[in-house]
């Protein structure tokens, strides 16, 4: 597929550092050329520049009328106002319509759900409506977007990256039919060395092994030599949205941020955990790395397996077996319901992830606990949290104490005053970096997945997650959240008011560009 070419084995590769340098230099030359032409037009071609200004005005009107967040459009308005030629050229290169031409469109809807699966989902929704009527709306909302509701699924909450990754590697070692991995980051190191040996051994045994990873997330961390080794033994590797040196083919946005692992159809994992040493605290980055995820065993695993297959097929992959081969084969009996779902920019402006979050916030009556590494809310999300706080809901927002990006943290902190004013408790996880993405409501519903509470996750990146209703794992999640609070510092209004003058000056400026963080 154009814009998403799969690099073939034997293709000449260069080191990550040289590759980055080449891309940066070529981009600088191209952007410099654009700026030079713009100023030439401005100084010497008044008539042409007037035409450009009129064109910029029409483009601004077009952008305003497109669906989407006004905060995103505001950046383009400012750019078109300050430098019309540059703004127009950048929009046509990197604006919404230009970049979306290169997105996988899910035009190949393999695998199609048989009527029996849809019927079981409808039966599950009816049962959920009787048991937990407050959550039937969310379940129906996702079902209408083709994300089925499952029973007969054991959902295990995994409160640490090290626990999840050890569990995953042990399961991969037992695989008999297939192993599917889709990750934003696959980083070479101790964890990868162990996993690679198992993957190669399984491929030699005839197990179907497929890997999807995002090129931008791995440009310095996953070498061409590693890809060659995998392909030599039969592992199929697909590179999502390769970083390109030409500006019209370079996509800063629309990355594959999902974390999905599927083994033999019966087991699937998702959450915030990538495959890299820092996620298991083998190496230290930003203090203690606190992450989490879930393991699905049973019917619900199919929701994540099907999502992987759709992405793989849209990247040019071929599924070597019939549909039923990839479905769960081992029956499981368990309490509660689960509903895996995915999100991506092709859905805009209908974004399941943000819509689900808003429904969870508005549905809270007693407790609303949230963990997220990045908090850059839009107006609707911010308003919903404030309404929940004003309504007497115990709202707790848990964020990193040692953030990885100071500018994103600065933007998040700018919202604290308003949240605290409306009764929301904001906590900073003091041991280090809190990377888990989870929501718990009233001890009856929960979300765990890859979705951050920011514009990038809601609008620009491919994401995934699982809604869980009435399952025992919710208590495990609550226990972990209580532990996080015990190891966190409550942010007070007085402390927030004492932040530095420099930080206060930068906050409104950074908010303008928050959508690209």
Sequence positions of predicted segments:
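N-terminal localization/anchoring segments of enzymes in phospholipid and broader phosphate metabolism
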Residues: 1-355, 359, 363, 403, ...
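Histidine/acidic-residue-rich catalytic or RNA/ligand-binding cores of hydrolases
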Residues: 380-382, 409-411, 441-444
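Catalytic-core elements of nucleic-acid end-processing and repair enzymes
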Residues: 437
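Short, glycine-rich nucleotide/cofactor-binding loops
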Residues: 185-190, 371-378
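Internal, well-ordered alpha-helical scaffold/interface segments
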Residues: 362, 383-386, 413-417
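Active-site donor-binding acidic/aromatic loop of nucleotide-activated sugar
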Residues: 426-430
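Helical hairpin unit composed of two closely spaced alpha helices linked by a short loop
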Residues: 374-396, 400, 405-407
């Amino acid at each position: 597929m154009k814009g998403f070419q799969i690099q073939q084995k034997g293709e000449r590769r260069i080191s990550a550092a040289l590759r980055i340098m080449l891309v940066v230099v070529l981009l600088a030359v191209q952007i410099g050329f654009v700026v030079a032409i713009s100023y030439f037009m401005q100084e010497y071609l008044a008539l042409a520049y007037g035409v450009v200004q009129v064109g910029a005005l029409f483009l601004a009107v077009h952008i305003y009328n497109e669906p989407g967040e006004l905060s995103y459009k505001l950046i383009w308005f400012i750019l078109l106002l300050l430098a019309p030629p540059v703004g127009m050229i950048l929009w046509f290169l990197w604006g919404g319509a230009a970049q979306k031409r290169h997105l996988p469109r899910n035009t190949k809807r393999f695998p199609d759900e048989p009527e029996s699966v849809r019927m079981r989902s409808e039966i599950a929704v009816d049962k959920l409506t009787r048991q937990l009527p407050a959550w039937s709306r969310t379940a129906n909302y996702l079902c209408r977007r083709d994300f089925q509701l499952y029973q007969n699924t054991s959902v295990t909450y995994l409160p640490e990256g090290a626990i999840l990754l050890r569990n995953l590697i042990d399961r991969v070692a037992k695989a008999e039919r297939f192993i599917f991995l889709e990750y934003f980051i696959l980083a070479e190191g101790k964890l990868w060395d162990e996993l690679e040996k198992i993957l190669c051994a399984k491929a030699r045994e005839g197990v179907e092994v497929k890997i999807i990873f995002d090129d931008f997330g791995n440009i310095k961390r996953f070498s061409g030599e590693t890809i060659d080794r995998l392909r030599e033994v039969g592992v199929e590797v697909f590179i999502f949205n390769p970083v390109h040196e030409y500006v019209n083919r370079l996509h800063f946005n629309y990355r594959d941020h999902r974390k999905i692992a599927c083994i033999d159809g019966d087991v699937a994992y998702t959450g915030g955990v990538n495959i890299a040493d820092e996620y298991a605290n083998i190496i230290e980055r930003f203090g203690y790395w606190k992450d989490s995820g879930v393991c699905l065993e049973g019917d619900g695993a199919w929701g994540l397996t099907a999502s992987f297959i759709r992405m793989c097929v849209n990247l040019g992959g071929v599924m070597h077996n019939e549909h039923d081969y990839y479905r769960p084969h081992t029956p499981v009996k368990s309490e509660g319901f689960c509903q895996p779902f995915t999100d991506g920019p092709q859905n805009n402006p209908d974004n399941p992830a943000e819509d689900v979050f808003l429904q969870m916030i508005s549905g809270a009556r007693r407790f609303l606990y949230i963990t997220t590494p990045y908090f850059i809310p839009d107006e609707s999300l911010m308003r919903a949290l404030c309404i929940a706080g004003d309504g007497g809901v115990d709202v707790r927002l848990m964020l990193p104490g040692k953030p990885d990006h100071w500018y994103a943290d600065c933007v998040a902190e700018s919202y604290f005053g308003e949240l605290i004013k409306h009764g929301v408790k904001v906590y900073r996880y003091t041991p280090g970096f809190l990377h888990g993405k989870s929501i718990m409501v009233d001890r009856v519903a929960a979300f765990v997945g890859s979705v951050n509470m920011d514009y990038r996750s809601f609008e620009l990146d491919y994401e995934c997650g699982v809604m869980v209703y009435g399952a025992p794992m919710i208590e495990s999640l609550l226990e972990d959240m209580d532990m996080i609070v015990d190891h966190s510092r409550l942010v007070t209004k007085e402390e927030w008011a004492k932040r530095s003058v420099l930080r206060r000056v930068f906050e409104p400026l950074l908010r303008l560009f928050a959508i690209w963080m």
